[in-house]
């Protein structure tokens, strides 16, 4: 039994090239564009715009002076 040759001949297995791994994946190929977050970049409008100083009504001031 040790002398009996292997029935399976050492025939070279034809390596058929797999086409799917060779072609590059398109999603992996193209670089992902890093879109910058707009919310932190754009300044908050409420602190940015200066608060308009309301002009003092003269009648209110006059009333205060009159009361004194």
Swiss-Prot record:
Region Disordered: start and end of each range? Answer: 1-68
Q: Molecular function terms in GO for this entry?
A: nutrient reservoir activity
- Report where it is expressed, by tissue: Developing endosperm.
Which spans does this entry mark as compositional bias, Pro residues?
1-24, 33-55
Q: Which segments show compositional bias classed as Polar residues? A: 59-68
Q: Which UniProt keywords are listed?
A: Seed storage protein, Storage protein
Q: Tell me the domain of life.
A: Eukaryota
> What does the record give as the function of this protein?
Sulfur-poor seed storage protein.
- Under which name does UniProt file this protein? C-hordein
């Amino acid at each position: 039994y040790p002398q009996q040759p292997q029935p399976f001949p050492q025939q070279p297995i034809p390596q058929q090239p797999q086409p799917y791994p060779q072609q590059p994946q398109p999603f992996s190929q193209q670089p992902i564009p890093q879109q910058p977050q707009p919310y932190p970049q754009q300044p908050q409008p409420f602190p940015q715009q200066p608060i308009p100083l309301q002009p003092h009504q003269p009648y209110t001031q006059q009333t205060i002076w009159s009361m004194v």
